[in-house]
Amino acid sequence: MTDVPVSRIRNFSIIAHIDHGKSTLADRLLQVTDTVQQREMKEQFLDNMDLERERGITIKLQAARMNYKAKDGQDYVLNLIDTPGHVDFSYEVSRSLAACEGALLVVDASQGVEAQTLANVYLALDNNLEIIPVLNKIDLPSAEPDRVAAEIEEVVGLDCSDIIQASAKAGIGVDDILEAIVQQVPPPADTVDQPLRALIFDSYYDAYRGVVVYFRVMDGQVKKGDKVRLMASDKEYVIDELGVLSPTQVQVEALHAGEVGYFAAAIKAVADARVGDTITMANSPAAEPLPGYTEANPMVFCGLFPIDADQYPDLKDALEKLKLNDAALSYEPETSSAMGFGFRCGFLGLLHMEIVQERLEREYNLDLITTAPSVIYRVTTTDEEVIEVDNPSLLPPIQKRLKVEEPFIKVEMITPETYVGTLMELCQSRRGVFKDMKFFTQTRTALIYELPLAEVVTDFFDQLKSRTKGYASMEYQLIGYRENPLVKLDILVNGDGVDALAMIVHRDKAYYVGRAMVSKLKELIPRHQFKVPIQAAIGAKVIASEHIPALRKDVLAKCYGGDISRKKKLLQKQAKGKKRMKAIGTVDVPQEAFMAVLKLDPQ
């Protein structure tokens, strides 16, 4: 057993928007409490994936146990459970918040409250956490602590009269933060005598030990060698290794209610130890699991194909390995006439999709083509059957469809007032429905829109950032399905449909998208020896077309003067050859053409 009583344990997390200094603050807390020796310290200690360091975001959750001697002379154990700040991972955030009793709300003193911060604060309030506001980066010349403190009071409704002013980089105010955690965050409930219940808030795959599970003991106690059951996946394991994270793993014999630790038990895949699952004893299980477990469902889908067909087995292996570590990733084999063999993959959101692609290319040295992202459509067929379609090429023909429904999301954008107009215009052009507008302070405004998810998955976020010079932030949640007049837009190159370019669009926008698409392809597909028509069609009706003229040799060059019939003969011979070539020739569609779909601007 670790010797600290439950009353002297504090479990807390840090809530902050991307770039507001959360990881740096975590570094300082580790340093001040001597958890990490000075020589081992490096920037962003808890972000241990290269990609996290590079993008400056936290993807996987980290946890760290710190021993702190408070001003009252007592020794406390502080467990920091770090959370990802990005909207795609909000389920993981909610689980890690459920493992805490308190949270530090870190806000950049020069920027103020952002949308994702707000979303996570609401999650924290739902979990009844004690929230301690902290102003970070107060040493910046552009810091406006009074304005931002007023904004936090206004927007979040927290009392900021004694807000902690800190600078994680300069190390200002770190002791105040530690004291505030001890004084204000309530200790965990003392339920050591009850049957074991523990919450899994993260897990990762280790090549030697199998899955390593990070968990927080809610009730009871757990010892090394215990046989435990995971309630959602209903599997039983014997704990081989039990320990605490200070941030490196340190083995212990037992953990009791209120403590945070890890265990390894030869679990084969992360999917068997899902985030949010409840751990209990196999022989004396708890009556009911901890609340709040849900399966993470993918929302965005796209096809991944290797540029070189020989890399297909490598892509398969890479996806299998990533899946061990990322339970939210789903994939199934797919074949395409244009691209060959590949996989249809499902992701939590756009950032998740980009990260998976980048990890595949970086860690497994693969060259990939990705098709345009799509969402799950619900189609009711004429036989009253409801099917879910995540790939445009699988949409049933128009005669067999009664209605098509698409997922809608509620988007909350927080922006400086000057950019409200351009953002409203952006949402309007994406079939958005205006719902509400709130003025937080003189300069900051929240816009709430309902939008089809399909309109957001392509480049909405990039547009939002570029139209507001990077100042706006957004947060979204799924609100359900709605019926819309959606059609499948096919792209035909030389008379053949290219399934990787097919897309599902709103009927009113189909012409503009088709028009933009064919003119873009005309620029990107190289000229061939024969004329290549490019068409956009809905069913059998062509709505837009372009032609790429043939490359042709001047066959009359050697006829100086001479008879017209001689020239006609040569031209007809050439035309005949071109005709034959067109019948048997294939058109080479380059990789850029598939990428162009993502960056279309159908105006």
From Swiss-Prot:
Q: Which SUPFAM superfamilies has this protein been placed in?
A: EF-G C-terminal domain-like, P-loop containing nucleoside triphosphate hydrolases
Entry's Gene Ontology BP terms: positive regulation of translation; translation
Q: Which reaction does it catalyse?
A: GTP + H2O = GDP + phosphate + H(+)
Q: Where is the tr-type G domain?
A: 7-189
Principal cellular location given in the protein's record? membrane
Give binding positions for GTP: 19-24, 136-139
Task: List the molecular function annotations (GO) for this entry.
Answer: GTP binding; GTPase activity; ribosome binding
Membrane topology (UniProt): Peripheral membrane protein
- Key words, A-Z: Cell inner membrane, Cell membrane, GTP-binding, Hydrolase, Membrane, Nucleotide-binding, Protein biosynthesis
The places in or outside the cell where this protein is found are:
Cell inner membrane
Quote a single Gene Ontology cellular component term: plasma membrane
Any idea of its EC number?
Answer: 3.6.5.n1
Q: What function does this protein fulfil?
A: Required for accurate and efficient protein synthesis under certain stress conditions. May act as a fidelity factor of the translation reaction, by catalyzing a one-codon backward translocation of tRNAs on improperly translocated ribosomes. Back-translocation proceeds from a post-translocation (POST) complex to a pre-translocation (PRE) complex, thus giving elongation factor G a second chance to translocate the tRNAs correctly. Binds to ribosomes in a GTP-dependent manner.
Cross-referenced PANTHER family = TRANSLATION FACTOR GUF1 HOMOLOG, CHLOROPLASTIC (PTHR43512:SF4), TRANSLATION FACTOR GUF1-RELATED (PTHR43512)
Family assignment from sequence similarity: Belongs to the TRAFAC class translation factor GTPase superfamily. Classic translation factor GTPase family. LepA subfamily.
Protein name per the record: Elongation factor 4
Q: Which organism is it from?
A: Synechocystis sp. (strain ATCC 27184 / PCC 6803 / Kazusa)
Q: What is the lineage of its organism?
A: Bacteria, Bacillati, Cyanobacteriota, Cyanophyceae, Synechococcales
Query: Gene name?
Result: lepA
